[in-house]
Amino acid sequence: MAPVSREAADAADAATPPMLKHWREVKAQHPATILFYRVGDFYEMFHEDAELAARVLEITLTSRGDGVPLAGVPVKAAAEYLRQLIAAGHRVAICEQVEDPKLARGLVRREVVETVTPGAMLQEGWLAGGKNNFLVALSGAEPEVGLAAIDLSTGEFLLETLDAAGVAEALGRLGLAAIVVPGDAALPTPDGVLRTTRERWEFDPDLAREEVARRFAIATLDGLGVGPGDAPALGAAGALLRYLTELQPAGMPHLARPVVRRSDAFLWVDEMTRRNLELVEPLRAGARGCTLLETIDATVTPMGGRLLRQWLLSPLRDPAAIAYRLDAVEVAVRDGRGRERLREALDGVRDVERLAGRAAAGRATPRELGALRDSFLRLPDVSEALSALAASTLPVPTSPHPQQSESRPSPPARGEHAAALADAADELDLLADLASDLARGLEERPPALLADGGVIRPGYDSELDELRALRDGGRQYIASLQQRERQRTGIPSLKVGFNKVFGYYLEITRAHAARVPPDYERRQTLATAERYVTPELKDYEARVLGAEERMGTREAELFGALRSAVGRAIARVQRTARVLARLDVWAALADRAVAGRYVRPRVHDGFDLVLRQSRHPVIERMMARELFIPNDAQFTDAERVALVTGPNMAGKSTILRQIGLCVVLAQMGSFVPAAEASVGVVDRLFTRVGASDNLAHGQSTFMVEMSETSAILHNAGPRSLVLLDEIGRGTSTYDGVAIAWAVTEHLHDR
């Protein structure tokens, strides 16, 4: 191909329309991103973006007059198309018109106002209410890796420094939506998760320290709990903030201060164990009611649903912290009426956390602000129900715990109030000022869109009331004018009408054309009628249409002020949302405990694990009309290995799983399905259940089994709970028995 001359290139550039030139400039700044370019009432896409969008969205691919490929979607319907592109794993940059086209001189000014990715979404209704949407950044290498996670929809910001071997487990705990890593790093990325690479310098801890301090207006990070050993996590946080700032140029005012998490505070549950125990996802895709989360989730708010999922995926290891939660659950179990009052009060609370985040970001619609108002107005009922529960005391035991010995710590104190409920009562902000402002300002049922009008309540603003009176009075004026003109002209069919093109007009049929007064000015000719205007009608039109335009502007100003008030109070709203989430989880766990006849476990730092008449919570609930046979399990410091034998379909795998599920429930702060439970804190939980191959990676059933078993043997410690089902069945009987024997011996002796 012959080289293109400079003159030819200049000529081609000169022939390119100014709008397309600007599109190219913006596109160059956002490579590997589909650009939604606002043109009037459409978002248009050009060149390769148009071709890709046409395939994914199944929309028409056309071209401009100059042959440039073109596809577009209406602005009003753009949200659904945008959601489809994000679900397909694409990034989309939204380039909006940032000035009124009527006032523009030349090309309308446009800017990218947001880049939407699977890990950075603020759009209404896109995310599952009961699940976080974390964008995660990883930094560092052996032996320590830093992790930073931000859920843009809720404002949560987490930091964690962990061993390189624990990265996959930590990512599984979060349930991330996308990941950011240095371009030269060999860090793990879960399958199906969008991966973004950044320059190594962006992960520098010193730069990150400055970035975090500047963003949250603090002089030092000491108050955040960031220590010298958290440099890797800090580096990840800096890169993550820088990346999100590019995606959200308008800012992230709802972003909370980072919370430092310590990996040794949580029970290690790897991906294999989460899958085998079906904690949050079923083994069979699409199966319903098969997970532990579905079994225990009786929450009534989206915030509570998300927190319950977090607790289930991150059980605790500190007996005192576990008892703190269990005390609250026990009070709610014992006070059934108080529990139901609390749940009824919470039932009308919407997703305050995400709605407030959208308000702070200037994205909340009138209907969403109305949902916040309705939620805030329920807070006094929540507070009253909480105060009654917090006043309840835990019962004083009449005898020592059956499994208690002098070498074991005592169970939590009784005859006292639950500290968790008292703390929640102290922290709950009724947000009375916001509730009052929103109740006075918003209509009872605000519309979905501000442009629809009818957002602000009458009597809230005198200027708006005057403009509305002028508009509403116009209806009477039109009726009066029509009657007067009929009498003056003697034309009984004369009528006053309006359309967006010609404005107000007087319409007269051709049969009465001879009676048209001389002061009527013809405006439009129809097949059977003529349309006219008069000086009086022109003057009225100018006044009314001007009033409607000013009314829309004023209503937008007032709504913006109400939304900004929520944004300014975002920290208070987020604190209250966190309290509501905890209350919802405690009440839900209590409700499930009562319905399932669960008992409070005694959680301690010994090595005993005793379960009397334990049941599998999921299976028991699924076979509600059948009798589930309970089973005992007992492990002590002296007897730490148990072999379960029996015929096929006798329930051996069920017993293994129910032991694991009872431990998870106990350490997350829930009652457990048993007659009695004593749980010595477990630091790591491993399971090897079932047989499967991994042909995509060239691994047979036996290879997968041995790889998983090897990982367990390398990572299990003195406080680990290991549940192995039929080790060695992927090979011959003789070899399988030898493998099972060797593995059992190793676990027993270590």
Locations of regions flagged by a protein language model:
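Amphipathic alpha-helical coiled-coil segments and their boundaries
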Residues: 315, 335-338, 365, 453-456, ...
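Intrinsic disorder/low-complexity segments
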Residues: 391-417
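Charged catalytic and DNA/RNA-contacting regions of genome-maintenance
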Residues: 2-334, 340, 344-360, 364-394, ...
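ATPase nucleotide-binding head domains, primarily ABC-like/P-loop NTPase cores
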Residues: 47-50, 300, 311, 509-541, ...
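Active-site phosphate-binding and catalytic loops of NTP-dependent enzymes
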Residues: 95, 118-127, 251, 479-491, ...
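Charged, surface-exposed helical/loop "interaction arms" that form contiguous linear patches used
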Residues: 361, 365, 378, 420-423, ...
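Extended, charged coiled-coil "arm/hinge" scaffolds of SMC/Rad50-like chromosome-maintenance ATPases
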Residues: 443-447, 526, 530-564, 580
